[in-house]
């Protein structure tokens, strides 16, 4: 018992809970809510229950990244995902952003276009999804079949870039502190960047520079619209998802980081780790992001299934400035507090990740205090 106070004091000083200055934004800790698709925005309009969900996970000086949000009607690939392209959607986001800001947290919106990761059911007038290619995604083990995409014409690409620009502007109008461009996980930007998907012969295909041209032009447009200090990007050069991989991920990641550095003050680069290896029953971080971390001038956020111990280590080692948590934060709304106390974590229920219920698996994960109160009642 005499050692308990020392343990609490040590826990308060863990690397994940040290303050950090991201550009001009002051963070009180380094535990970031990763963007998580939750499929609960009925009719593509954010709902009041999202204000409960996000404010539960908000702490003073914490950073939350909202779920991937459609930039246009053609951007959708999953049911009930939110948009940011109509005035109704902008107005619906405002009270959600306000709820997070009342907690003193910072809130960024991830903006995306899924490209070919869609079906005609989600597309306007039942049209084919658009992509860099007309190659269809190979059905996965779940049996999900995505529709054959239509290859974007060269003269159509500026419109998609402008959709990203307007989405960023709309996000700022809704009150968000900034935006994260979704350039990861096999969605539209990666369908251009990665050579397994991009088979174009125009200026957006072929060489690495050409394949990255679309993503770079999106970045340029968004930065010009809202300022580099309000823009981050998520990249996953090593990830093979949705039939989207690259023959030289290090070259791809390095090239993209170099393009980010051309914008002075570009806020952050959020990268996803290669798969973690299992060695002697424990996960081992591949540390594959180190070259990009060294090259990038701004804040570097790492993601990829980290736990408390791994997150503390990468911050202490200078491998990352911030660590994004997805499933752990989904299931533990008070995750920074639990990390501080090294408290037990709620287990997540995968079966409720993408259901449309506004409470179950969404806002009903208990806080530590609720568990403690239940224990006291049980043993009283």
Curated annotation (Swiss-Prot):
Induction: By wounding, jasmonate, salicylate, salt, drought and cold stresses, sucrose, copper, cadmium, mercury, UV-C, fungal elicitor and ozone. Its cofactor is FMN. It catalyses: (1S,2S)-OPC-8 + NADP(+) = (9S,13S,15Z)-12-oxophyto-10,15-dienoate + NADPH + H(+). The active site is at 187 (proton donor). Pathway: Lipid metabolism; oxylipin biosynthesis. Probably involved in the biosynthesis or metabolism of oxylipin signaling molecules. In vitro, reduces cis(-)-12-oxophytodienoic acid (cis(-)-OPDA) and to cis(-)-OPC-8:0. This is 12-oxophytodienoate reductase 1. The gene is OPR1. Keywords: Fatty acid biosynthesis, Fatty acid metabolism, Flavoprotein, FMN, Lipid biosynthesis, Lipid metabolism, NADP, Oxidoreductase, Oxylipin biosynthesis. It comes from the Eukaryota. Its EC number is 1.3.1.42. One of its GO terms (molecular function) is FMN binding. Pfam families: Oxidored_FMN.
């Amino acid at each position: 018992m005499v050692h308990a106070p020392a343990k609490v004091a040590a826990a308060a000083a863990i690397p994940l809970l040290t303050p950090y200055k991201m550009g001009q934004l002051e963070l009180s800790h380094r535990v970031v809510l990763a963007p998580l698709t939750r499929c609960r925005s009925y009719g593509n309009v954010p709902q009041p229950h999202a204000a409960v969900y996000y404010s539960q996970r908000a702490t003073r000086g914490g950073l939350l990244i909202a779920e991937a949000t459609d930039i246009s009607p053609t951007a959708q690939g999953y049911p009930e995902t939110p948009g940011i392209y109509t005035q109704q959607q902008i107005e619906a986001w405002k009270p959600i952003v306000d709820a997070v800001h009342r907690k003193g947290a910072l809130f960024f919106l991830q903006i995306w276009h899924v490209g070919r990761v869609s079906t005609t059911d989600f597309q306007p007038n039942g049209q084919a999804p658009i992509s860099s290619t007309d190659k269809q995604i190979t059905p996965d083990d779940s049996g999900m079949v995505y529709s054959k995409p239509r290859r974007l014409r060269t003269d159509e690409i500026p419109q998609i870039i402008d959709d990203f620009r307007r989405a960023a502007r709309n996000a700022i109008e809704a009150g968000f502190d900034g935006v994260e461009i979704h350039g990861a996980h096999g969605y539209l930007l990666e369908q251009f960047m990665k050579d397994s998907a991009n088979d174009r012969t125009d200026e957006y295909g072929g060489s690495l520079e050409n394949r990255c041209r679309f993503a770079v032009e999106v970045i340029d447009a968004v930065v010009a619209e809202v300022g580099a200090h309000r823009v981050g990007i998520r990249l996953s050069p090593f990830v093979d998802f949705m039939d989207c991989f690259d023959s030289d991920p290090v070259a791809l990641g390095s090239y993209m980081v170099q393009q980010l550095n051309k914008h002075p003050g570009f806020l952050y680069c959020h990268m996803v780790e290669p798969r973690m290896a299992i060695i002697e029953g424990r996960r081992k971080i591949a540390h594959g992001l180190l070259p990009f971390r060294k090259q990038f001038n701004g804040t570097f956020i790492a993601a990829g299934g980290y736990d408390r111990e791994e997150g503390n280590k990468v911050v202490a080692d200078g491998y990352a400035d911030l660590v994004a948590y997805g499933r752990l934060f989904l299931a533990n709304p008070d995750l920074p507090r639990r990390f501080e106390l090294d408290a037990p974590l709620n287990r997540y229920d995968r079966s409720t990740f993408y259901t449309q219920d506004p409470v179950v698996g969404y806002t009903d994960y208990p806080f530590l205090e609720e568990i403690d109160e239940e224990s006291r009642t049980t043993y009283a």
